[in-house]
């Protein structure tokens, strides 16, 4: 009584430090909370037979991997480190995992050849009998270091020789069906358990090489944005490929050739060589150490040996560091200032565009608390005029965080009038203006009418005075009595015209 049942999930949680160390050795990070969520919920909801308590069955792990590595928007790149660590615990189990491993399946017997080894030519056949010739033995990859890169259109992996005996004349059954793509497509024989990695264990316990296919590179390039547009997304994709596929040096060059431009590749390689560690673990400046650890030409690394695999592991880590370093852009604040809030854009959408501009045109992280002041100023001064004016008048603005300003901006935005309300307000304002103008015009007209009325009154008084009748002996010109107007001394008189008298004698 009181005993608890140990499950694969609880077992990994009890040995969490070792699980994290295992993931760290593979170049990834895992977190306990997400580990539990994926095992108990996310992978169960994929409907591939994953139990809530977890499992170390490679069949279940492979089914989950097919969902995670699905191309395009159907995949789950964020879950790659977790399923990779699960597979690592199942394929290379520590001592505390071995008792919980499922029993191994009996090996599938190879089918008998359809035709026995002929000692003499067949007497009857549907096809003409061709003379047999011993085929040349395929070389073990990688070939001569001076040879060119592997052909991208190669779909069949280069096999490793299984022995020195002659090959059977009948059709042979491969030990593992070749992959059509590096995205873990469904295999024809689900009973055979194999790991879809470029370097995996072959029939003779030797690593077997699986090159990239043209369809893989095409899908990765077409379903992801360019590095110049979204370096974070493409870096995450390449990281998942490096972790899960464990590519060789040639594979890495093909990957960079397909996904990056020439200028971008140069930046990535330059940043990666800056991160080559020295003996003290810090980046070194010694050219020989840099060329040995991160070579620019094909190295003589044999992935079949532990030393070669260690070189490749360090090379992939440095390549990933170079991608992250090249993703940092030069500062271009002019592009950030061009991001302004639209007339009908919400403050939240504008803030997201502003942060994206900081990520794209500056090396700064807008989520970094040290950059909060710059983001706040850009958010205030690049908002729409009505929001900007009200945000600037807030009391204690220096104590506001970006979240507080976003809330205030949302309040201002939500209180905005609708187009109908704005039209009604403008109509009322125009009506009030017209009423005021009409009132002023009425006053002006009343003043003019009053002035005209007073003038008419004065003129009427003067007219009445001029119509007073004159006296009998009163002058009509000077209004004095004693004479008439024709005899008025004050009246100007016309001078008589000078007449020239002509003498009759003249």
From Swiss-Prot:
The keyword Transcription regulation does not apply. Residues 497-506 have a biased composition (Polar residues). A lipid is attached at residue 2 (N-myristoyl glycine). One of its GO terms (molecular function) is structural constituent of virion. A motif (LYPX(n)L motif) lies at residues 126-130. A motif (PPXY motif) lies at residues 157-160. GO terms for cellular component: host cell late endosome membrane; host cell plasma membrane; host multivesicular body; membrane; viral nucleocapsid. GO terms for biological process: viral budding via host ESCRT complex. It comes from the Viruses. InterPro entries: G_retro_matrix, G_retro_matrix_sf, Gag_p12, Gag_P30, Retrov_capsid_N, Retroviral_Gag-Pol_poly, Retrovr_matrix, Znf_CCHC. Residues 417-434 have a biased composition (Basic and acidic residues). Residues 120-132 have a biased composition (Low complexity). A motif (PTAP/PSAP motif) lies at residues 118-121. Residues 100-119, 136-146, 156-171 have a biased composition (Pro residues). RNA-binding phosphoprotein p12 is phosphorylated on serine residues. SUPFAM superfamilies: Retroviral matrix proteins (SSF47836), Retrovirus capsid protein, N-terminal core domain (SSF47943), Retrovirus zinc finger-like domains (SSF57756). Gene3D superfamilies: Gamma-retroviral matrix domain, Human Immunodeficiency Virus Type 1 Capsid Protein, Zinc finger, CCHC-type. Pfam families: Gag_MA (PF01140), Gag_p12 (PF01141), Gag_p30 (PF02093), zf-CCHC (PF00098). The record marks 127-128, 197-198, 445-446 as: Cleavage. Residues 97-208, 417-440, 486-506 are annotated as: Disordered. Keywords: Capsid protein, Host cell membrane, Host cytoplasm, Host endosome, Host membrane, Host-virus interaction, Lipoprotein, Membrane, Metal-binding, Myristate, Phosphoprotein, RNA-binding, Viral budding, Viral budding via the host ESCRT complexes, Viral matrix protein, Viral nucleoprotein, Viral release from host cell, Virion, Zinc, Zinc-finger. A zinc finger (CCHC-type) spans 473-490. PANTHER family: GAG_P30 DOMAIN-CONTAINING PROTEIN (PTHR33166). This is Gag polyprotein. The gene is gag.
